[in-house]
Regions:
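Conserved adenylate-forming
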Residues: 102-148
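Nucleotide 5′-phosphate-binding alpha/beta core
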Residues: 1-91, 96-97, 132-133, 140-144
Length: 148
C-alpha cells in the first residue's frame, strides 16, 4: 500500500520504479537525496511547497542530503505518536540533549525533534552542552522523583 502510494504521488520514485519495477527494491539511493528534491505530494495539494527542509551533516566538502517536509504538523505528529506508542506520553519524560556536533549546525532533523520533545517534556528537560554536573544532578533528581 505504501509502495503504491509513493509510486503514484512521488514523481522521482515513480521514475525509479519504472526502471526497477519490483516492490522488493522499493527505496531510492541516498545519492538521490543530494541531487533531487524528493517529495511525496498530497493529491489534494499537488503544488504544495515544503514547510521545512532538513539537511544531513555530510562529510567535509560533500553535498548534503536534503529531507523535504511538506507539513510541519504531520511531521511532529508522526514522531510524537511513534515515541508515545513505545514509551508513553512525552510529557512524563525529562529529555536531556547532549548533542554537541549537531547543535553547531543548522538543518538537523534530530535537533528539531529533540528540541520539540524538550518543549513538551518535564521542566528540567533541555540541551546541556558540556554541563556534566548539571546533567548528573538532573538524573539524580529524576531518579529520586521517579521521572523517566
Amino acid at each position: 500500500m505504501i509502495y503504491q502510494y509513493q509510486t503514484k504521488n512521488n514523481p522521482i520514485f515513480q521514475r525509479w520504479t519504472e526502471q526497477f519495477p519490483t516492490p522488493d527494491f522499493g527505496f531510492l539511493p541516498i545519492a538521490f537525496f543530494k541531487s533531487h528534491s524528493i517529495v511525496t505530494q498530497n493529491p489534494q495539494e499537488p503544488n504544495q511547497l515544503p514547510e521545512i527542509v532538513f539537511s544531513s551533516s555530510g562529510t567535509t566538502g560533500s553535498i548534503p542530503s536534503k529531507h523535504h517536509v511538506l507539513s510541519d504538523e504531520l511531521y511532529r505528529q508522526s514522531y510524537t505518536q511513534a515515541f508515545e506508542l513505545m514509551y508513553g506520553p512525552v510529557e512524563q519524560y525529562c529529555f536531556i540533549g547532549l548533542l554537541p556536533s549537531y547543535l553547531e549546525r543548522s538543518g538537523s532533523s534530530l535537533i528539531y525533534m529533540v528540541d520539540d520533545f524538550i518543549k513538551q517534556g518535564q521542566p528540567k528537560s533541555g540541551f546541556y552542552l558540556n554541563e556534566y554536573q548539571a546533567v548528573a544532578n538532573i538524573i539524580q533528581h529524576n531518579q529520586s522523583n521517579q521521572i523517566p
